Amino acid sequence: MAKALQGVMAALLTPFDHQQQLDSESLRRLVRFNIGQGIDGLYVGGSTGEAFVQSLAEREQVLEIVAEEAKGKITLIAHVGTVSTAESQQLASAAKRYGFDAVSAVTPFYYPFSFEEHCDHYRAIIDSADGLPMVVYNIPALSGVKLTLDQINTLVTLPGVNALKQTSGDLFQMEQIRRAHPDLVLYNGYDEIFASGLLAGADGGIGSTYNIMGWRYQGIVQALREGDVAKAQRLQTECNKVIDLLIKTGVFRGLKTVLHYMDVVSVPLCRKPFAPVDEKYLPALKALAQQLMEEKA
């Protein structure tokens, strides 16, 4: 299973319609588009998927639709994390039922939980996942939970934990984790340092911009396998030029707008309170979509 979890995993966006409801047809197209890019898997229902502005029923529906489109074709990881252990367990059970390959959960947030409470939270989810491996999700910038290296080392050695999504930007810590846990599947979480993350010991990555240019990240992996660091650096620079623009537009809404221009997503809106893309960025996003479509062709 560890080998199946390695690679380039797109953190899947969740399309909505003009009424802010789940757009299941756009979601199906997006899953197929990602498969067509040659990515290794999908990370479903995470930060990029706007999970925390969805109901539990909606999150289950997303898991079901993605499984219908992609089960058996690529690796599927269900992010089931919520601030509630019981709700996370419910989503983990759904992931097992729909045939996902693994579950993942962000550290419980908002309340100042003790570290032992964090551990108990993960143990309960792992139990409900009924044999599916757990990917611990460390993203201190959004969760507000700043785990120490010792705490990370403890979490990744809990029975049932097979992987870590490390979205901290700390490459030294990435290398320390790899050194301490040579068999752990380790994902780089920040797209803009993907190549550096691989050099620091990551097995692959989980990222939002893979939705529109997954082949570039696969190219970075291949270049490093071949020892061509200069090529990997060039590809990372091209990815980062895109990320520069998306930071200005707002990453999720910018990605949806690009996918709208690619005829993948019908409505380029995130769920409120996220606002639409500022119209001044639309020409640049349309040009980017055209460039990427030509590059992919």
Swiss-Prot record:
SUPFAM superfamilies: Aldolase. This is N-acetylneuraminate lyase. The active site is at Y137, K165. One of its GO terms (cellular component) is cytosol. The gene is nanA. InterPro entries: Aldolase_TIM, DapA-like, NanA, Schiff_base-form_aldolases_AS, Schiff_base-form_aldolases_CS. It catalyses: aceneuramate = aldehydo-N-acetyl-D-mannosamine + pyruvate. Belongs to the DapA family. NanA subfamily. Pathway: Amino-sugar metabolism; N-acetylneuraminate degradation; D-fructose 6-phosphate from N-acetylneuraminate: step 1/5. Its EC number is 4.1.3.3. Aceneuramate binds at S47, T48, T167, G189, D191, E192, S208. One of its GO terms (molecular function) is N-acetylneuraminate lyase activity. It is an enzyme of class 4 (lyase).
